[in-house]
Amino acid sequence: MTQTTAIFMATALVVLATLIPTYIISKRSAVSEDDWAVADRSLPIYVVIGTQFASAMGGGILVGHLGNAYLNGVAILIYGFLTALPFFFVMIPAKWLRQNNFTTVPEILRHFSNNSKFVGILAAVMTIFVPFGWITSQITAFGSIYSTITGVNYNLLCIVFTFVSLLFVMPAGLKTVAWTDFIFACFMIVMCIVSVIYVTNMGGGLQNILSTVDPDMISMSGSIKKLGAGTVLLWVFSVMPGGVTNQLYFQRVCAIKSTVYKGLHRVGI
């Protein structure tokens, strides 16, 4: 068995091990419109935490910004902070959103505009536009990684992964997406811990790494200088507005089973 075959077989097993349980969960009852939009408002808080985490920490961070941190240092933590901060803002109206049974950002804005169709259409277009880069980054990140380690054509991998992604949506919309996100979030956390331990050992221990790395890489001011203050400023004016208006975040808040939000701050943490 070649390395490429082994990688694809392992990937297929992980996908199936995630899809099958979530498919069974989604098929316990008939699929409704609410299942597709807000998972029938039945998601436990721990699933919401997992799916929000997986939505925020997708391919852009796991691949792009991980490489960015390798090149420019600890300043990349600012991006992670800006990604998490919107959750605390979303938490403020969370109970009101859930009690009013909203499902989408356009629906919320139409509520404040006397049910204006123009506002609804404009909001719908922007709701698609804002997370478009995040969504495509998942596909391109997969293509970049697997093309490098397998030698398979990058464009072909992106197309295949697009269709695989549809398999997570087709059974019951957000209900299956949320549960698969939760499973993947657990997997991401475990692999993060394993990777930190493994890489630290490869580097000869934390003290050895700190003594050999460029001091600017582990200094916030030096790292910002390497990265560019303009880049950090652009993050502030793109990630923050994008986060507090992100349909993905609001949709999952509206899908929480309970209207009690004492634990919702855990999403941001």
PLM features: residue spans?
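Small-residue-rich segments of transmembrane alpha-helices in multi-pass membrane proteins
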Residues: 43-51, 112-122, 184-198, 269
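Helix-loop-helix module between adjacent transmembrane segments
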Residues: 18, 78-170, 235-239
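Residue-level recognition of pore/gate-forming positions within transmembrane alpha-helices
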Residues: 15, 55-56, 83-87, 127, ...
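Membrane-interface helix-loop-helix modules in multi-pass membrane proteins
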Residues: 37-103, 237, 249-269
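Membrane-interface "cap" regions at the ends of multi-pass membrane proteins
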Residues: 1-62, 169-172, 185, 191
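Juxtamembrane interface elements at the cytosolic ends of transmembrane helices
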Residues: 17-33, 93-106, 167, 173, ...
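Selective recognition of specific alpha-helical transmembrane segments in multi-pass small-molecule
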Residues: 17, 125-135, 187-199, 232-244, ...
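Hydrophobic alpha-helical segments and their helix-loop junctions in multi-pass secondary transporters
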Residues: 21-29, 135, 139, 149-160, ...
